[in-house]
């Protein structure tokens, strides 16, 4: 797909992320795999003011085009693509319930079968590191090895998928799961969970059932 169309999709995803209540202000960032690198949102520009010309290209060596500044979190986007060859889009936000669970430094367990949408029986919580650092990108790469989404301790959420629509859908789904988890934790701890065997059945069914969006 041509660059301007991808840039427009990135902007639309940012605006939809805000509309869904997953983000606010200039927090969060969105990227898509492009050529040997990626296109990513810039730093410090409110989503409603973004234009296609603001979107930044970063090559496979981590060098961004002149005259533009990418999101400070570009390193963990790059790490996500390196860790997940199947991913073509990454969404990061500071959704309230996901961030609350990340403050507890807990993974989201198999409280609901939709946990399998992230690729396993839980959604991990990557250890804290300062935003924008190589250390954080290393934590992200490890957490995403076997999952499509991870919480970031004291920070937020990352979701990656084959395209932007699926990545945003997954981010929204994880926020709902985080809300369910916190609601259940208010009643009992530990919370009841589905077994690994039950999640394995769901994972198998998800191979032929799920969000149908053109790649």
UniProtKB/Swiss-Prot annotation:
It is an enzyme of class 4 (lyase). InterPro entries: Aldolase_class_II_sugar_metab (IPR050197), Aldolase_II/adducin_N (IPR001303), Aldolase_II/adducin_N_sf (IPR036409), FucA (IPR004782). Belongs to the aldolase class II family. AraD/FucA subfamily. Keywords: Arabinose catabolism, Carbohydrate metabolism, Fucose metabolism, Lyase, Metal-binding, Zinc. This is L-fuculose phosphate aldolase. Substrate binds at residues 28-29, 43-44, 71-72. Pathway: Carbohydrate degradation; L-fucose degradation; L-lactaldehyde and glycerone phosphate from L-fucose: step 3/3. Involved in the degradation of L-fucose and D-arabinose. Catalyzes the reversible cleavage of L-fuculose 1-phosphate (Fuc1P) to yield dihydroxyacetone phosphate (DHAP) and L-lactaldehyde. The active site is at residue 73.
């Amino acid at each position: 797909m041509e660059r301007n169309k991808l840039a427009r999709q990135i902007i639309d995803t940012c605006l939809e992320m805000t509309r869904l209540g997953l983000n606010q202000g200039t927090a969060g960032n969105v990227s898509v795999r492009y050529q040997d690198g990626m296109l990513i949102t810039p730093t410090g520009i409110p989503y409603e003011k973004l234009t296609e010309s603001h979107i930044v290209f970063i090559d496979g060596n981590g060098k961004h085009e002149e005259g533009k500044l990418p999101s400070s979190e570009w390193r963990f986007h790059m790490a996500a693509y390196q860790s997940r060859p199947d991913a073509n889009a990454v969404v990061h936000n500071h959704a309230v319930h996901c961030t609350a669970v990340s403050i507890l430094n807990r993974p989201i367990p198999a409280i609901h079968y939709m946990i399998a949408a992230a690729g396993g029986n839980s959604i991990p919580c990557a250890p804290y590191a300062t935003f924008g650092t190589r250390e954080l990108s290393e934590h992200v790469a490890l957490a995403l090895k076997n999952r499509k989404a991870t919480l970031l301790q004291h920070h937020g959420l990352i979701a990656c998928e084959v395209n932007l629509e699926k990545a945003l859908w997954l981010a929204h789904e994880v926020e709902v799961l985080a809300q369910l988890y916190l609601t259940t934790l208010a009643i009992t701890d530990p919370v009841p969970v589905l077994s690994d065997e039950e999640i394995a059945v769901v994972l198998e069914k998800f191979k032929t059932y799920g969000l149908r969006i053109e790649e």
